């Protein structure tokens, strides 16, 4: 039914698809490894930080991303007032809080 030239053409086309499938077999695991080593932990860290910021309350001792220690004096929607020392307060954006060191009991 097919001439020999048509058969050779089909073999060449099949060979090209096979090469594509081999490329996929290499590429898909690389993407999966990248996802589990880079993207997934970063998402988890972002989720934990959002939860920490949501649970901030007056009296918590915190550390900012700039390395400043303070005690939460007042909370706003997007900002927080930290007491750095007695009679010394500063306003920070909530996202600049890196860690809650201890919570008020």
UniProtKB/Swiss-Prot annotation:
InterPro entries registered for this protein in UniProt: Preprotein_translocase_YajC
Membrane topology reported for the UniProt record: Single-pass membrane protein
Record's keyword terms, sorted: Cell inner membrane, Cell membrane, Membrane, Protein transport, Translocation, Transmembrane, Transmembrane helix, Transport
Bilayer-crossing regions: 19-39
Pfam families in the record: YajC
GO biological process: protein transport
One cellular component term from this protein's GO annotations in UniProt: plasma membrane
Protein localization: Cell inner membrane
Family under the similarity heading: Belongs to the YajC family.
Self-association and partners: Part of the SecDF-YidC-YajC translocase complex. The SecDF-YidC-YajC translocase forms a supercomplex with SecYEG, called the holo-translocon (HTL).
The protein's role, per its UniProt record: The SecYEG-SecDF-YajC-YidC holo-translocon (HTL) protein secretase/insertase is a supercomplex required for protein secretion, insertion of proteins into membranes, and assembly of membrane protein complexes. While the SecYEG complex is essential for assembly of a number of proteins and complexes, the SecDF-YajC-YidC subcomplex facilitates these functions.
Protein name, per record: Sec translocon accessory complex subunit YajC
């Amino acid at each position: 039914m097919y001439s020999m030239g048509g058969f050779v053409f089909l073999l060449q086309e099949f060979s090209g698809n096979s090469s594509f499938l081999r490329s996929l077999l290499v590429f898909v695991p690389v993407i999966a490894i990248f996802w589990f080593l880079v993207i997934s932990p970063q998402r988890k860290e972002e989720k934990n930080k959002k939860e920490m910021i949501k649970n901030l309350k007056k009296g918590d001792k915190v550390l900012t991303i700039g390395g400043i220690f303070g005690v939460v004096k007042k909370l706003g929607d997007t900002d927080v007032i930290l007491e750095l020392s007695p009679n010394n307060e500063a306003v920070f954006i909530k996202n600049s809080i890196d860690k809650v060191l201890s919570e008020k009991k």
